[in-house]
A protein has these predicted regions:
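Secretory targeting signals
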Residues: 5-83, 122-140
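Transmembrane helix-loop junctions in multipass membrane proteins, especially transporters and channels
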Residues: 27-39, 87, 107-115, 158-164
Length: 165
């Protein structure tokens, strides 16, 4: 169980730091170098409200962390699929394939595409909410739940595989 948990957490942390670092680099290049950020420009999400209030650093930090949580979900999902299937290429393709499958399956359901319940909110997009802190809290909770479910499902699969190896 500890091996599987650490493997899954490694995937989540890899995704967290990769996407978080990429978001930071993007914001540095777009904002600092190109000069595209001001109090009324930049990221077109609910985090924009913090920029408009003058809390630019806090708004950008929460935006980067929001994206990094998406990366954690994507990284753990890829690692989870490498536990289910003994093929590293499945782990690389799984997050996008899973996202496309969920989006296709949920198309007819009455779920708003900008809500936390829509799959793109789990993997990439910033969903809507009444406050910045509600949106960030929902994203953190969704990431915690999705990663927890993957850990709970992955541990017995890996135990069974190691017993029969």
């Amino acid at each position: 169980g500890v091996y599987t948990f650490s493997k899954l957490m490694g995937g989540a942390m890899g995704g967290f730091f990769t996407v978080g670092g990429g978001s930071l680099l993007f914001l540095l290049v777009a904002g600092v170098i190109a000069g595209n950020f001001g109090p009324t420009q930049g990221i077109d999400t609910i985090y924009q409200s913090l920029l408009e209030q003058g809390q630019i650093v806090w708004g950008l930090v929460l935006f980067i962390l929001h994206n990094a949580l998406s990366g954690a979900t994507i990284g753990m999902l890829g690692t989870f699929f490498t536990i289910l299937f003994l093929n590293q290429f499945v782990g690389v393709a799984a997050p996008l394939s899973f996202y496309l499958l969920l989006t296709r399956l949920l198309t007819g359901f009455p779920i708003a595409e900008n809500s936390i319940y829509w799959p793109s909110s789990w993997f990439s997009a910033v969903h809507t909410g009444s406050t910045v802190y509600q949106v960030f809290g929902e994203k953190a909770l969704a990431t915690l739940i999705l990663c927890g479910v993957m850990c709970l499902l992955g541990i017995p699969v890996m135990r069974r595989r190691l017993r029969h190896a």
